[in-house]
């Protein structure tokens, strides 16, 4: 089996999780990696086959998404080009850790895609929600990664497809 593993490179958590998950996937399949975004401060420590700027969000001073700053620095033409040019048809499966290029390319090309991310847990109907909801953030969360099957990582396994977090060996 040939798998494309899409990793969101805009945060340290996605890369740290990939460092633990990739060796397991490599035992069972031939795995290639796409890393999109470039804000992680962690050295991946694994081979990256494809790189993309992806769709990167800028953070506000309060820790949320700075929408205007994100829009002004986005390059939708590059994003669409990357989605169209990614050779996703040569894979049997795409696994996406909230990575949009691989998941949108999989959707467009009819390749099965699974979302394995913290965001899948946060977006789950049983996930604890704040009293006031950021509608734009909720929209982005539900459309950023269009994978049909979703498995989430959260502090509590509150549903059948939600698991406790993947913790790096260095921290355990």
Spans of features found by a protein language model:
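A generic structural motif
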Residues: 27-33, 89
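Active-site regions of enzymes building and remodeling cell-envelope glycoconjugates
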Residues: 43-55, 110-113, 160-170
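A nucleotide-sugar donor-handling region in carbohydrate enzymes
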Residues: 124-172
């Amino acid at each position: 089996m040939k798998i494309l593993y899409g990793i969101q490179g805009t945060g340290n958590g996605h890369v740290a999780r990939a460092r633990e998950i990739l060796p397991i996937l490599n035992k069972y399949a031939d795995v290639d990696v796409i890393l999109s975004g470039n804000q992680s401060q962690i050295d991946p420590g694994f081979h990256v086959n494809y790189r993309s700027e992806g769709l990167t969000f800028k953070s506000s001073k309060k820790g949320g998404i700075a929408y205007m700053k994100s829009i002004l620095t986005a390059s939708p033409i590059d994003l669409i080009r990357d989605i169209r040019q990614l050779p996703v048809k040569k894979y049997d499966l795409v696994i996406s850790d909230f990575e949009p290029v691989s998941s949108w390319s999989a959707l467009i090309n009819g390749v099965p895609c699974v979302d394995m991310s913290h965001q899948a847990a946060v977006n789950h109907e049983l996930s604890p929600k704040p009293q006031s909801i950021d509608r734009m953030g909720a929209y982005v969360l539900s459309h950023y990664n269009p994978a049909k099957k979703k498995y989430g990582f959260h502090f509590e396994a509150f549903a059948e497809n939600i698991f406790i977090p993947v913790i790096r060996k260095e921290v355990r």
